[in-house]
From Swiss-Prot:
Family: Belongs to the bacterial ribosomal protein bL36 family.
Keyword Ribonucleoprotein attached: yes
This protein's GO CC annotations: chloroplast; ribonucleoprotein complex; ribosome
Compartments reported by the entry: Plastid, Chloroplast
Family matches, as SUPFAM superfamilies: Ribosomal protein L36 (SSF57840)
Lineage of the organism: Eukaryota, Viridiplantae, Streptophyta, Embryophyta, Tracheophyta
Entry keyword Flavoprotein: no
Main location: plastid
InterPro entries registered for this protein in UniProt: Ribosomal_bL36, Ribosomal_bL36_sp
Record-given protein name: Large ribosomal subunit protein bL36c
GO molecular function: structural constituent of ribosome
Record keywords: Chloroplast, Plastid, Ribonucleoprotein, Ribosomal protein
Organism: Populus trichocarpa (Western balsam poplar)
Length: 37
């Protein structure tokens, strides 16, 4: 899980999800998991 100032999609399979006011990126590739903090 990377925590970044700007979370963005890295590949086609990345999905952008808003959960409790946070932006999460969920992907089939575990390296692409991000959270905007």
């Amino acid at each position: 899980m990377k925590i970044r100032a700007s979370a963005r999609k890295i590949c086609e399979k990345c999905r952008l999800i808003r959960r409790r006011g946070r932006i999460l990126i969920i992907c089939s590739n575990p390296r692409h998991k991000q959270r905007q903090g």
